[in-house]
Swiss-Prot record:
Gene3D superfamilies: Aldolase class I. GO terms for biological process: biotin biosynthetic process. Pathway: Cofactor biosynthesis; biotin biosynthesis; biotin from 7,8-diaminononanoate: step 2/2. The keyword Metal-binding applies. [4Fe-4S] cluster binds at C78, C82, C85. Its EC number is 2.8.1.6. The gene is bioB. This is Biotin synthase. Residues 63-288 form the Radical SAM core domain. Homodimer. The keyword S-adenosyl-L-methionine applies. Its cofactor is [4Fe-4S] cluster; [2Fe-2S] cluster. Pfam families: BATS, Radical_SAM.
Length: 342
């Protein structure tokens, strides 16, 4: 059978039957076209889809769930115009620029570790780090290492090669830089820098030996076709971790009046991304509380998710850490231990 004939046969077949053979049995992620067909499935097949995504997660990732906490080292005043973000200095947002001191950073790391988390991510609202920020990050990492047994990640915007090398030398375990959305939709979301600039940073991070964390936000006006495109973009990048956020419209931002993504669409997307990325850590991130609520959080963890951010996010409230940990315990999902992630 030719490649074209095989594609036609796959298109004609039921996409979940194809996924069961291709993804569950062979570990090969769905293509962009196949992901689109998953995203187009009706609500009456959602339960079946989530069950398959859970099987894939258990088969290729195992039962453990990685827990992470995040903290904003530098909040607000960002010069970029990411339309979803209340930290941009270009919008009429209530968020104001502020820096966190090192003792507060260390205390946040301690509290994160107490929750059972193995990863602590230091975040800054910047286009990219300047010398002041890099010095503060270096001091913070050293202070945390002296008191807390936890892996450290950073999210500091776009990097130069020299900055990548410096962060690697500091012992940064994982670097987060989200592509945010499909390449074709990105100009509708950000105009002050390009999708390619973000991609270039991610490639340098990987080449330096740090783990790559890259995901985005769903519900920013993208089409289903673009949602499938985004999954394919991520599959090409092959990140170690994909955080999935759902738009929580922020007052004063260009996306402040967008509607929240329906829960069924969000869950379909979670499962579709799992089927596209069978071996990748897929993390519940911002916006899940407003989009999915408590029941949706459970469905997501039983529908492909195998990592969570506990506690609050950068400018919005998250679920209490205790609620997530209790849910994982109820579902008999063990929290990934620090020694198993080294």
């Amino acid at each position: 059978m030719t490649e074209t004939a095989e594609l036609t046969a796959a298109t004609d077949a039921d996409v979940l039957a194809v996924a069961r053979e291709q993804v569950l049995e062979q570990g090969v992620g769905l293509t962009q076209e196949q992901v689109l067909r998953v995203l187009q499935l009706p609500d009456d097949r959602l339960e079946e889809l989530l069950a398959l995504a859970h099987e894939v997660r258990m088969r290729w990732c195992g039962p453990e769930v990685e827990v992470e906490g995040i903290i904003s080292l530098k909040t607000g005043g960002c010069p970029e115009d990411c339309h979803f973000c209340s930290q941009s200095g270009l919008f009429a947002s209530p968020v104001r620029s502020a820096w966190l001191d090192i003792p507060s950073l260390v205390e946040a790391a301690k509290q994160t570790a107490k929750s059972g988390a193995t990863e602590f991510c230091i975040v800054a609202a910047v286009r990219g780090p300047d010398e002041r920020l890099l010095a503060q990050v270096a001091a913070g990492i050293e202070a945390i290492r002296n008191e807390v047994d936890i892996q450290i990640a950073c999210s500091l915007g776009m990097l130069t090669q020299e900055q990548v090398d410096r962060l690697s030398a500091m012992g940064v375990h994982r670097y987060n830089h989200n592509l945010e959305t499909a390449k074709s939709h990105f100009p509708n979301v950000v105009t002050t820098h390009s999708w390619e600039e973000r991609w270039d940073t991610l490639k340098m991070v990987r080449e330096a030996g740090m783990e790559v964390c890259c995901g985005g936000i769903l519900g920013m006006g993208e089409t289903l076709e673009q949602r499938a495109e985004f999954a394919a973009n991520l599959a090409e990048l092959e990140p170690d971790e994909v955080p999935l956020n759902f738009l929580n419209p922020r007052p004063g931002t260009p996306f402040g009046d967008l509607e929240v993504l329906p829960a069924s669409d969000a869950l379909r997307a979670v499962a579709a991304f799992r089927l596209a990325l069978p071996r990748t850590m897929l993390r519940f991130a911002g916006g899940r509380e407003i989009t999915l609520g408590d029941l949706g959080a459970k469905q997501g963890i039983l529908g492909g998710i195998n990592a969570v951010i506990v506690g609050n996010y950068l400018t919005t409230l998250g679920r209490p850490a205790e609620a997530d940990l209790e849910l994982l315990d109820d579902l008999q999902m063990p929290i990934k231990a620090l020694n198993s992630s080294l």
